[in-house]
């Protein structure tokens, strides 16, 4: 396995650990606009229903939070043109600290990204770093309805089970 593949696998495990520990419904390799020229795939999409007072009600789905993660192992991966699709209410770029520093030094604007997540020193969790271009007054980046987002999560999990 190449160093790039190993880095991607390590970052992916950390994303999966974070999604699972926060009790999100999630899937990896989630496709949108499948079969069209605009088809896009997001590395990880998670969903947590809105549950005030820990009670599920009819608005729990529409008011829930969708979180998108794009995993990039190195600069060539970042600039490859693949990925960097952010459709969630909250969006994260996940990368090694060295790539984050490169992007920061170059002043690369990260549109629609709330934070950059890098492995902690222990390598057991993800640590947030500021995204350049993030606007805290912007409440949500999501432009797709909850039913579509959830359906794509279901489809991605179904396709994975079939393979």
Region spans (language model):
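Non-catalytic C-terminal interaction segments of nucleic acid-processing enzymes
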Residues: 2-38, 104-163
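Short, flexible loop/turn elements at secondary-structure junctions
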Residues: 30-32, 48, 72-75
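Active-site beta-strand-loop-beta-strand hairpin of nuclease catalytic cores
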Residues: 39-68, 85-86
């Amino acid at each position: 396995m190449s160093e790039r593949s190993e880095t991607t696998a390590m970052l992916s495990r950390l994303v999966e650990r974070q999604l699972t520990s926060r009790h999100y419904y999630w899937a990896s390799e989630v496709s949108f606009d499948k079969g069209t020229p605009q088809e896009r795939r997001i590395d990880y999409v998670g969903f947590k229903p809105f549950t005030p007072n820990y009670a599920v009600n009819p608005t729990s789905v529409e008011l829930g939070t969708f979180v998108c993660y794009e995993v990039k192992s190195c600069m060539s991966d970042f600039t490859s043109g693949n990925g960097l699709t952010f459709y969630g209410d909250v969006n994260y770029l996940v990368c090694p600290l060295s790539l984050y520093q490169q992007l920061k030094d170059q002043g690369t604007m990260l549109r629609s990204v709330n934070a950059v997540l890098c492995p902690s020193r222990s390598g057991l969790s993800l640590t947030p770093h500021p995204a350049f271009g993030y606007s805290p007054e912007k409440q949500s980046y999501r432009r797709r309805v909850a039913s579509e987002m959830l359906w794509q999560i279901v489809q991605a999990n179904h396709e994975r089970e079939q393979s």
